[in-house]
UniProtKB/Swiss-Prot annotation:
One of its GO terms (biological process) is rhamnose catabolic process. It is found in: Cytoplasm. The active site is at 22 (proton donor). GO terms for cellular component: cytoplasm. GO terms for molecular function: L-rhamnose mutarotase activity. Its EC number is 5.1.3.32. The keyword Isomerase applies. Pfam families: rhaM. This is L-rhamnose mutarotase. The lineage of its organism: Bacteria, Bacillati, Bacillota, Bacilli, Bacillales. Its main location: cytoplasm. Pathway: Carbohydrate metabolism; L-rhamnose metabolism.
């Protein structure tokens, strides 16, 4: 497994809506994440900075990279666009982080 950390940004007045949408995540989205090798996926919110910290473990970069191309993922991005910063293709603006420490 490869561990990945990343930062995204939720709009200041959309914290509750962001959480609600994830609490009600579509079963087909979860299935697609798993199909593309996602495990142990969590997102944390810093309410003071509006930053989201995502942590995910993936089986393989190539397999994971294909997730963005799926129709359900494209639909999810459009659904989430009103609550967070996004790119022109509706994907979340995201910054990958460098792991500097790990302990099992």
């Amino acid at each position: 497994m490869k561990r990945k950390g990343f930062i995204m940004t939720v709009y200041p007045d959309k914290h509750d809506e962001y959480e609600k949408r994830h609490n009600e995540i579509w079963p087909e989205m979860v299935a697609e994440l798993k199909k593309h090798g996602a495990h142990n996926y969590s997102i944390f919110l810093d309410k003071q900075t509006n930053q989201l910290f995502g942590y995910i473990e993936i089986e393989d970069e190539e397999k994971w990279s294909k997730m963005a191309e799926t129709s359900i993922n494209q639909k999810w991005w459009k659904f989430m666009k009103p609550v967070m910063k996004t790119n022109s293709d509706d994907s979340p603006v995201s910054t990958d982080l460098t792991e500097v420490f790990h302990m099992d």
